Amino acid sequence: MLFRSVITQNVDNLHERAGSTSVLHLHGELTKARSELYQDIIVPMPNQGLQPDSRCEKGSLLRPHIVWFGETVPFMSTAQNYMAHADICIVIGTSLQVYPAAGLLNHLKPQIPVWVIDPHLPQSNLPMGYQWIQSKAAEGMGKLREQLLSDAYIHFK
């Protein structure tokens, strides 16, 4: 079974707008609201935004579906599971300084290939054997694509 997923700390919906269909938003989503009492109740953000008295169907107040500083990241165990079962890992545009997300690389199996795409090499949390592509995201993804296609060609030649 081939499983592809994006784990992001971004709260926008740019991954979905770019066509990604399996996106785990660690820090929530600006386009959604959730119940203050029932974390499993997540609804689209009303067009007019949340009003001070906006409530879910169970009557509790709604709030932005965002993880504020100091709050627990609700999907952390799911993200750890994704990492534990990954065949490859591509880290794009992060300093790897924000926890607990920065610790996700610790859940990879030791032999998993890891690429880091960023103009500046993160100073910590890099697994052994990682490959660094010193570029911004779009350019770096192009370089990674070329590298993978070249490696596949050499492997199957």
Label each region the model flagged.
Residues M1-K157:
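Conserved catalytic alpha/beta core of Sir2/sirtuin-type deacylases, generalized to analogous enzyme cores
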